[in-house]
Amino acid sequence: MPFAQPPDYSKSVFPIAVGIAVAVVLFTLTRSTLPQVGDNIHNLPHGGNYQDGTKRISYCGPRDSFPSSSLISSGTPMIIGIIIFLIFAIYVSEKWSRSGSRRCSCCVPGAPACTATVHE
């Protein structure tokens, strides 16, 4: 009775994991961290004026130094630098940890590219 390999789910799980990771990163970068200004009906997060009867709201908006909800802000060069540094660090660690030779994790003994030994 020949043994069958277990199904390889990595090809279907990997795109799902990447999609979830991208969604979490975009949600984190685009969520609003601005203070809530106004009441339950009138919201002025970016500044403005509103007058209704006896109610008057005048808000000048957040300062440039306040962390905003925009995806591209003044801290973007630092974020890009951190990403490039992490990519470089992963590349260097992969080069040094493998000591130059790569072997396949699963190979058939006797195949031309296989370095495994035959055990009987």
UniProtKB/Swiss-Prot annotation:
Predominant subcellular localization, coarse grouping: host cell
Annotated source species: Apple stem pitting virus (isolate PA66)
Topological domains, Cytoplasmic: 1-8, 93-120
Keyword field contains Protein biosynthesis: no
General remark: TGBp1, TGBp2 and TGBp3 seem to act together for cell-to-cell propagation. TGBp1 is the main movement protein that physically cross the plasmodesma with the viral genome. TGBp2 and TGBp3 would facilitate TGBp1 function.
Keywords from the named record: Host endoplasmic reticulum, Host membrane, Membrane, Transmembrane, Transmembrane helix, Transport, Viral movement protein
Lineage, broadest ranks: Viruses, Riboviria, Orthornavirae, Kitrinoviricota, Alsuviricetes
Transmembrane segments: 9-29, 72-92
Free-text function comment from the UniProt entry: Plays a role in viral cell-to-cell propagation, by facilitating genome transport to neighboring plant cells through plasmosdesmata,.
Stored Pfam families: Plant_vir_prot
GO cellular component terms given for this protein: host cell endoplasmic reticulum membrane; membrane
Protein localization: Host endoplasmic reticulum membrane
Topology, Lumenal side: 30-71
Similarity comment: Belongs to the Tymovirales TGBp2 protein family.
GO biological process, one term: transport of virus in host, cell to cell
Keyword Membrane: yes
Protein name (record): Movement protein TGB2
